[in-house]
Amino acid sequence: MRSGIRRSLLALLCLGLSQLQAAGQKTEAPRYPEQGQIVVHQEAAPNRDDANNAAQGMQTPVLGFVSSAEQGELRLLLGIPGASALGEPLAVPAGLRDLFFAPNQTYALLAPKAGDVLGLMTFQGVEEGAVASICGAIPQPDIVAFSPGASTAALYSRAEGRLQVITGLPGSPQLTRIVPGSDLPDEVQYLAVADDGVTLAEGTAHNAVYVLPQLGLPRLLYTAGDLQGMAFAPRTGDLVAFDRAAGTAFLLQDVEGASSYVLLADGLSGLDGNVFLQTSRAGAVIASTKSNSLWEINLQSLQAQNVPLPGMPQMLQPLRISGDFLLFFRTGLPAWILDSNSAEPGISFVPAGAAPSKHPRPLPFSTIHVLKDSQSAQPDLVSQGASGAACTGVPEPTPAPKPPPRTTY
């Protein structure tokens, strides 16, 4: 069924982007590599205005978005893996420090370099939406973890010494939980939040994995030799994690309940540098910045595949379709995309684009989202004007009461 859908989408893409083909240029149909090989679909660099116009007029599939916070650049990815093109830059607010895409790329959280307002930008089709200012949220989080379905985000700031959980994203954000740093078992290295918006796990700087119940003390689940990433599987309370010292990926099932350990794969070697771990409907993917291959794990069959790459990736960013990931993007160089939904994961290139011919005017933080404290009926924000002025007069939500001390027998 997927191959039929792929052929239909490819036919539509070729019709919508026919103006982008260089005269006489022949484009091979996309194909996926045999085991141990990398097949790259080469395309002529298209005209960006034509790409955006074709996408709007022909309903070309949107693969996702690519961004560079350092350059203030955000671009559309049109097409499907193996047949895709970059669009012209989209408008983003000026002065961004970080841009955190939700897993399905229907919205992103925007952290400013200065100021005390966290932004939220939604994406409808091929266009960016309005920018919302989420008053009361941590403005410059060090760690952001989304639930697999993207309706919940956990934010942590070392400078502020607190953790927040925001549910109802993107349309109705609500602050449902605040955890002071003093209530955390150790320095936060990783966070993971499940699709229920409640189940929350912390990976510490000393390689321990804890579940953080809403009521009760943090509970130790596992201690790894070198914890290098963790994420919940979609629609479950099961946590996938990677221990680089042991070369193992493992599953902690039902972390809020009895919790049990399941070995997913061992012998996962060569993952030096910064490690990325993501989950999707297709399984789990583990990659690193100093390895020219990655590991794909099927969570049902427990089969692990080593997938060769054309170089060392710089990210593992989920795209619009669950199981598609952006591995590399830099202006002037081809982008790399992983499609892990097929039996044999495929790597494809997006043609390198020239430097943007134009940049849209930066957007202001101009729309206000009501971010409510679930423990109080009082909204914790004050409206601001379109100039992007800081939120003022925002009452600090009251943290949940601490649980009684544990009795030792």
Language model features with spans:
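Bacterial N-terminal signal peptides that target proteins for export
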Residues: 1-9
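Bacterial N-terminal signal peptides
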Residues: 10-19
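Beta-strand-rich domains and repeat architectures in extracellular enzymes and scaffolds
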Residues: 38-79, 87-103
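Repeated scaffold domains used in trafficking and secretory/extracellular systems
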Residues: 47-55, 94-104, 137-150, 183-193, ...
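Short beta-strand elements that form the blades of beta-propeller/WD-repeat-like
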Residues: 61-68, 105-111, 151-156, 197-202, ...
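Structural motif
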Residues: 71-75, 115-121, 160-166, 206-211, ...
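Short loop/turn segments that connect beta-strands within beta-propeller blades
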Residues: 80-82, 122-126, 167-171, 212-216, ...
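A short beta-strand motif characteristic of beta-propeller blades
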Residues: 85-91, 129-136, 174-182, 216-222, ...
